[in-house]
Amino acid sequence: MNYEARPDASDSAQCAAGMSDKVAANPLDSDFIAEMTRIFRNAWVPVCHESELPEPYDFRTTSIGNENVIICRAPDGKINALLNVCPHRGMLIERRPQGSFLEGQASGNPKRITCMFHAWQFDMRGNCVYVAREKEGYQERFSKDDAGLRRLRCTVNYGGFVWVNMNDQPVSMLEEWAGPAFGHVEQQLNSVHLEVVHYHKEYVEHGYMTEALEFLSAAKHGSLFDFGHCAINANGDN
């Protein structure tokens, strides 16, 4: 199927008003950087549901924009969001999609988040608790207190969903950011017990029917709780 997109008068008007007429594909593209900065670094993003972390030391990994994030439950039951990057050499720490730190990793101790590069270890709040050869290699020039994982703004609300904001000083808190539009949704979400019971991934060989499936199928846009809203990607990812 060949289709040539031709800009019409409305497209020209939008471009004239300052809207870009191209898709940002290069990570260094100014539009892409603006999107990461103005949207993903300032919005409250739902990353998972609290039921996915039922026990202390349970974790999930995800990404917000182009940043890798660990969501984990601390021993006191609090859910924390941490940047999934070691402050030592910028290594991606946890590559598994989910699991538990209770038993420890191959290169670390139980109940620790461990970077496999140099075995630096962190607790569930992101505090650095172990540095290999700390005294021999750093003497008094270094303190673990200054080497923790970056903690992100994190809260649980609206039916138990975990929301994260990449901005250390958010422009607004979640409730203010959500605004009146969330009033009806909040009532629905909080009126029933929500729990993630399994994960489902669906591969689509071709994406030519994506638009019809996404906008016309009753199963996609029925009751919020009767049907699951599945994201469909033209590349066949979901």
Regions found by a protein language model. Name each.
Residues E52-D168, S172-L174, G179-P180:
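Rieske [2Fe-2S] iron-sulfur-binding domain
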Residues R73, K78, V156-N238:
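C-terminal catalytic domain of Rieske-type non-heme iron oxygenases
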Residues M36, L83, A212-F215:
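A generic alpha-helix structural signal
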Residues A43-W44, M91, K220:
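Generic structural signal for secondary-structure transition and capping sites
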